[in-house]
């Protein structure tokens, strides 16, 4: 069993190795590291626009065809450099299982690997966090909210589940102590977050490998909210969603159709543009 204090490592962080660095969630974390002058190394199966952009910004990325079996290769030397260091962290995406050769290498050499969600939790602990959750709509809402905050004078940071057309990135940097994150229910990843505001956009049965029944998923959302009770200033729910929190005072609903605490009115002109109020 590997005993480690990841929080202490994070405080002194100098380098990170990302297994599955080309994934949309992991690559955003890599961009944050690069912005904060932390050395970034990583692996993915093939080169993509995402991995090429990371390399352009300073990351060292290795691909599947670069064999680990070749002694003293650059990749092998990088992996060795993470052994016994108290200022480095290895992060893996949810797509990487425990039998992946790089994860196995680190396990054999007693190097602790942590999930993407745990690393995001470590980062977000230094911010006031707005967590966007729900089985559908997280990326759209997170991106819209980030842009609204930016143009409204709040220079927030954000980790998005897609590439924003406004910012050409899945990581949006900001100088204010506000962060927008997608709170992913898959594999109960959102349990690593400690948000100040939680929005739940939808609740449908999904991820049957994690939640055998809808009630299991609903219970996870309940736990996500309750574990953060001390931090929460408000909870925002889509109207008529199949979950409620009567035990909390600051719970608000939003809707496009009908009345709610937050509602949206929009008009479409002849050019196809919308006016929203």
Feature roles, as predicted:
Residues 25-28, 49, 166-167:
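Short N-terminal binding/cap micro-motifs at the start of the first secondary-structure element
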């Amino acid at each position: 069993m590997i005993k480690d204090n990841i929080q202490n490592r994070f405080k002194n962080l100098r380098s990170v190795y990302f297994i599955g660095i080309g994934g949309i969630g992991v690559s955003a974390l890599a961009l944050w590291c690069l912005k904060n002058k932390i050395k970034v190394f990583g692996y993915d199966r093939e080169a993509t626009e995402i991995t090429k952009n990371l390399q352009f910004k300073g990351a060292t990325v290795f691909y599947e065809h670069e064999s680990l079996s070749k002694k003293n290769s650059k990749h092998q030397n990088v992996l060795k450099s993470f052994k016994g260091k108290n200022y480095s962290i290895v992060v893996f995406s949810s797509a990487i299982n425990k039998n992946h050769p790089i994860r196995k290498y680190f396990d054999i050499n007693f190097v602790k690997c942590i999930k993407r969600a745990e690393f995001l939790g470590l980062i977000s602990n230094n911010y006031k966090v707005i967590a966007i959750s729900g089985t559908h709509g997280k990326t759209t809402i997170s991106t819209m909210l980030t842009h609204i905050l930016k143009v409204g004078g709040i220079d927030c940071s954000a980790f998005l589940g897609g590439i924003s057309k406004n910012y050409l990135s899945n990581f949006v940097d900001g100088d204010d102590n506000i962060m927008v994150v997608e709170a992913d229910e898959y594999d109960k990843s959102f349990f690593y977050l400690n948000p100040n505001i939680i929005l739940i956009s939808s609740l449908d049965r999904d991820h049957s490998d994690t939640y055998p029944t809808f009630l299991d998923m609903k219970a996870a959302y309940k736990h996500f909210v309750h574990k953060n009770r001390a931090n929460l200033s408000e909870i925002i729910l889509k109207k008529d969603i199949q979950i409620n929190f009567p035990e909390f005072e600051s719970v608000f609903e939003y809707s496009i159709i009908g009345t709610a605490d937050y509602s949206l009115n929009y008009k479409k002109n002849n050019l196809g543009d919308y006016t929203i109020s």
